[in-house]
């Protein structure tokens, strides 16, 4: 039973619990009308201390489509945080109003702190460069729906692997499925953090390699996960300007990829995928965004004990 559980990190749920969520998400996708009132009377609080379009709207749309309601804020300046209120007090107060919290925060570990003071489920919608578990559920559902299998894939991850929380969460999750291999494509400055390399990949004897060439990595990939270079994570903006366009996926590069390769991206896109790739049958990132809404519907219904 997932009722009343927090989701802070992909490892909080077992593979069996993932499958439970994916099964429900698939059922909702097939027959959304059947689920349009199951969260009637329930309230989701979206506490976004950091800008977001897709994740916040996905959560809000998901709850509204389940028949529930949404309260919250989309930037800290519009809340009592701007008056100096602590995270603890915000969470305790929101517990009085809502049945479920989805929170994004710039500080790593903030979701964990929130869960310590919450009697209602807390969903981590991204904490700094740490984890983004609902994006991971989105990614896994997309792969499962359109690729058919979460095992035995070669996954190339390209771009900002240092600060990219979606990358960290996805590696942690896919490492739990059998026979997956990873190709980590990034500039030296944006390599995967040591804790992912040592505690996840090497500790579990998972095959991986680190390279700097997208052209090389794309040849072997069953799944290519592109990410943007994140301006907001750089202290030195000249360093960002130097690295921002280091990887651009275009049709010329796609010619070197497998015919059935899947291109994913957590969005927003900046320059790292050319618009021409949108017309390629291997581009799945907008289908991925839609899967995100359905998987969040399934997750919230499960955490609230309504399905």
UniProtKB/Swiss-Prot annotation:
InterPro entries registered for this protein in UniProt: Asp/Orn_carbamoyltranf_P-bd, Asp/Orn_carbamoylTrfase, Asp/Orn_carbamoylTrfase_sf, Asp_carbamoyltransf, Asp_carbamoyltransf_Asp/Orn-bd
Coiled coil found in the keyword field: no
Gene3D superfamilies assigned to the protein according to its UniProt record, in alphabetical order: Aspartate/ornithine carbamoyltransferase (3.40.50.1370)
Keyword Transferase on entry: yes
Catalytic activity: carbamoyl phosphate + L-aspartate = N-carbamoyl-L-aspartate + phosphate + H(+)
Binding-site residues, carbamoyl phosphate: 54-55, 104, 132, 135, 267-268
UniProt EC number: 2.1.3.2
Binding site for L-aspartate: 83, 165, 228
UniProt entry keywords in alphabetical sequence: Pyrimidine biosynthesis, Transferase
Pfam families: OTCace, OTCace_N
Name of the top EC class for this enzyme: transferase
Superkingdom of the source species: Bacteria
GO molecular function terms listed in the Swiss-Prot or TrEMBL record: amino acid binding; aspartate carbamoyltransferase activity
Pathway annotation: Pyrimidine metabolism; UMP biosynthesis via de novo pathway; (S)-dihydroorotate from bicarbonate: step 2/3
Annotated GO biological process: 'de novo' pyrimidine nucleobase biosynthetic process; 'de novo' UMP biosynthetic process; amino acid metabolic process
Function, in words: Catalyzes the condensation of carbamoyl phosphate and aspartate to form carbamoyl aspartate and inorganic phosphate, the committed step in the de novo pyrimidine nucleotide biosynthesis pathway.
Stated family: Belongs to the aspartate/ornithine carbamoyltransferase superfamily. ATCase family.
Subunit structure: Heterododecamer (2C3:3R2) of six catalytic PyrB chains organized as two trimers (C3), and six regulatory PyrI chains organized as three dimers (R2).
Protein name per the record: Aspartate carbamoyltransferase catalytic subunit
Species the sequence originates in: Clostridium perfringens (strain ATCC 13124 / DSM 756 / JCM 1290 / NCIMB 6125 / NCTC 8237 / Type A)
Gene (UniProt): pyrB
């Amino acid at each position: 039973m997932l009722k009343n559980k927090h989701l802070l990190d992909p490892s909080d749920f077992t593979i069996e619990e993932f499958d439970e969520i994916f099964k429900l998400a698939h059922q909702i996708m097939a027959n959304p009308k059947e689920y349009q009132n199951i969260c009637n009377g329930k309230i989701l609080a979206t506490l976004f201390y950091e800008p977001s379009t897709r994740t916040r709207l996905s959560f809000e749309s998901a709850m509204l489509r389940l028949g529930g309601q949404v309260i919250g804020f989309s930037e800290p300046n519009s809340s009592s945080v701007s008056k100096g209120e602590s995270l603890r007090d915000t969470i305790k107060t929101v517990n009085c109003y809502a049945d479920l919290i989805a929170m994004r925060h710039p500080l790593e570990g903030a979701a964990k702190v929130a869960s310590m003071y919450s009697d209602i489920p807390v969903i981590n919608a991204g904490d700094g460069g740490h984890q983004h578990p609902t994006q991971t559920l989105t990614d896994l559902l997309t792969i499962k729906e359109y690729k058919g299998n979460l095992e035995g894939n070669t996954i190339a991850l390209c771009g900002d692997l240092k600060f990219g929380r979606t990358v960290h969460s996805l590696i942690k999750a896919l490492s739990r499925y059998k026979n997956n291999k990873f190709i980590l494509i990034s500039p030296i400055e944006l390599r995967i953090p040591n804790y992912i390399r040592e505690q996840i990949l090497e500790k579990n004897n998972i095959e991986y390699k680190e390279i700097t060439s997208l052209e090389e990595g794309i040849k072997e990939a069953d799944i290519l996960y592109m990410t943007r270079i994140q301006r907001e994570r750089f202290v030195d903006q000249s360093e960002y300007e130097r690295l921002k366009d280091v990887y651009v996926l275009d049709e010329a590069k796609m010619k070197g990829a497998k015919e059935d390769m899947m291109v994913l991206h957590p969005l927003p896109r900046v320059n790292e995928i050319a618009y021409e790739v949108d017309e390629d049958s291997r581009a799945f990132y907008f289908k991925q965004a839609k899967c995100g809404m359905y998987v969040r519907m399934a997750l919230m219904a499960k955490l609230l004990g309504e399905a």
